[in-house]
Amino acid sequence: MNVIILAAGQGKRLTTLTKNKPKCMVNLFGKTLLEWQISVFKKCGISDITIVTGYRHELIDFNGLTFFQNKNFETTNMVESLFCASEKLNKSTIVCYGDIIFEGKVLNCLIQSKSDFSIVVDKQWKKYWEMRFDDPLTDAESLKIDNDGNIISIGQKVQKINEIEGQYIGLMKFQNSGIEKLKQFYEKTKNQSKNKPNPLNPHVSFNQSYMTDFLQGLINEGCKLEAVQIKNGWLELDSIDDYNKYTELFSKKTISEFIDLDV
C-alpha cells in the first residue's frame, strides 16, 4: 500500500502564514502539517509515501519520500495534482489532501476497508463545523449515503442541513479494479472536455475540477464508493480563522474535543 499526498497549493486564505511557504508546511501544534501526516502514515505501517508539490516546492524536502511537481498548480486543482503522480497509481493507494491532520484510528479505518473505492466521511461533522463557522451551511457540502453504506451524492452546495449525512474530509483509498477504473475515467472525461463543456463540472475547466466533482462522476458511472464513517478525529487547516481557533483550543487544552494529538 502506498500514499499520495496532494500538497501543491499555496493556501491563500492562511494569509501571512503561507506568504513564503506552502500550506502543507504551516506549523500547527509544534509540527508542520506534512510532519503530522508522515508520522501517522509510518505509525500505521505505510512507508511508500509520495508528495505532489507545487507552490514553493523547493521547501518540501523529506528523506526517503517520492516527489512529483504540479507545475501548473496555479491553474489546476486536486484531480490534476493526483494525476501528476499517476505512475504511483499501480496498487492499493491512499490519497490525502495536504491540509488535513488525522488520528491513526481514522487512517486504520480506511486501511481496513476492502472496497475498490473508499472515502472517509465524518458523521459527527456538525459540531466541528459549528466551531469553525457562524453558519455551517456556508461551507458544508452535500453528502448522502444509501442503505448499503455507499455515497450517492457528494460536493454539492446545500440549502438544508438534512442534505448532509456526513462531511468528506479529503482522505480516500483506491484499490483492486478501482485503480484501473479511476485512470480510465480520468482519460475519458479529459478527452470529452476537449471540445465541449467539462463533463465533471460545466462551471469550471477540466483542469480546475474539484475532487468531489470527480468522485460524483465515478458514482454517476455506476461505481460504488464506500463511506468509511468516522466521528471526528481530524482537522482541516483552510483559513487563518481555522488556525486561530485551533491555536486557542490547543492553549486551553480543549483541542481533544475534535482530535487526539497523541494517537
Question: What are these language model-derived features?
Answer:
Residues M1-T18:
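N-terminal nucleotide-binding beta1-loop-alpha1 segment
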Residues M1-V3, I161-V263:
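Conserved alpha/beta core of the MobA/IspD/sugar-nucleotide pyrophosphorylase nucleotidyltransferase superfamily
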Residues N2-I5, K31-V95, S205:
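Conserved N-terminal catalytic core of the sugar/cofactor nucleotidyltransferase
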Residues G9, D99, S239:
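Active-site glycine-centered loops adjacent to acidic/histidine catalytic or metal-binding residues
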Residues N20-E35:
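Short catalytic helix/loop segments, enriched in acidic residues and glycine
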Residues C24, D48, T66, N150, ...:
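Conserved beta-strand segments of alpha/beta enzyme cores
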Residues I60-A140:
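Conserved beta-loop-beta/alpha segment of the NTase-like Rossmann-fold superfamily
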Residues G104-F185, T189:
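Conserved core of the sugar-phosphate nucleotidyltransferase
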